[in-house]
Amino acid sequence: MDFIRLDTADNVVTAASRLPAGHIVETIKTLQPIPSGHKIATAAIPLGGEIRKYAQLIGYASTDIPAGAHVHDHNVSFRNTLSLIHI
């Protein structure tokens, strides 16, 4: 398997190896090359939408993320992360 889905509630999967643009993941095509260990949106995620992995909220879309897109720090916002550092 080229990707790992950790929970059915997730809207991202993790690439198990480097995937080229156009690679089929479930029912969608990757829009760009995806590095091993990075996330791929399995459905469109609107600006501000929740990103879920492990059935847990891991961040919010900082821009509209189309299905098949690479999901990483360039398009994910981690709200309240800074406040946790000071606890």
Predicted regions and their residues:
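Conserved SET/PR domain catalytic loop and adjacent active-site segment
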Residues: 3-81
